[in-house]
Design a protein with these regions (language model features):
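Short, amphipathic alpha-helical "lid/cap" segments that border enzyme active or binding sites
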Residues: 57, 61, 173-181
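Hydrophobic anchor at the beta1->P-loop junction of P-loop NTPases
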Residues: 7
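Glycine-rich phosphate-binding loop used to anchor ATP phosphates in small-molecule kinases
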Residues: 52-113
């Protein structure tokens, strides 16, 4: 059964870049947050219908787990650790993968607000996330979310035995992918 690697952290911390690098290194499937968030936002507006977004993701994970020979999945997510709906979603995902014989591991990415503001508008970010094309608006939302939610843990992570923290100001996406793969002994598909 496949495992799930949840890469989480605040906006523009490097989740997609690290997830992409990890997928290239391991051959795992890369399922970034905006693959579901963008279509839901196009229909209902950004931030609307969070229950629908969670249900869509659960349905996709359920179908993925039903596929024979499905590789492990890398999922990126802005997890508001103090938001009950986000925590409930993660609990459901953990239960789903564990019931199927897989495990869920968490990679928390951290970086300073000034660094993340600089990263808004990078080519990879814009290619994966149409909602980020208005860079000043995306930067304003980043600052707003920073003040509104707890987007990084502070020694109180609910799954400490499956938790790795990496500072993306210290490591490149490729270096983060190498550290993640080494930490959980993921095979290197690139060799």
């Amino acid at each position: 059964m496949p495992d799930l690697i949840v890469i989480f952290g605040p906006p523009a911390v490097g989740k997609a870049a690290v997830g992409h690098a990890l997928a290239q290194r391991t051959g795992f499937r890369f399922f970034h947050n905006h693959m579901t968030a963008e279509p839901v936002a196009a229909l209902f507006g950004w931030g609307a219908a969070p229950w629908l977004l969670s249900q869509l993701r659960i349905t996709l994970f359920t179908e993925a787990l039903a596929q024979p020979n499905m590789p492990s999945i890398i999922f990126t997510f802005v997890w508001a650790l103090d938001l009950e709906g986000d925590s409930e979603f993660i609990q459901k995902v953990v239960a789903l993968f564990e019931a199927s014989g897989g495990q869920v591991v968490f990679v928390e990415l951290v970086a300073s607000l000034p660094t993340r503001l600089e990263r808004e508008g990078t080519p990879l970010r814009l290619s994966l996330k149409p909602s980020k094309h208005n860079v000043p608006s995306a930067q304003a939302l980043l600052v707003e979310l920073e003040g509104q939610y707890k987007l990084n843990s502070t020694n109180d992570f609910p799954y400490p035995e499956h938790h790795l923290v990496l500072n993306t100001e210290q490591y490149s996406p490729l270096e983060c992918a190498q550290r993640i793969a080494a930490h959980w002994c993921f095979n290197d598909a690139s060799t």
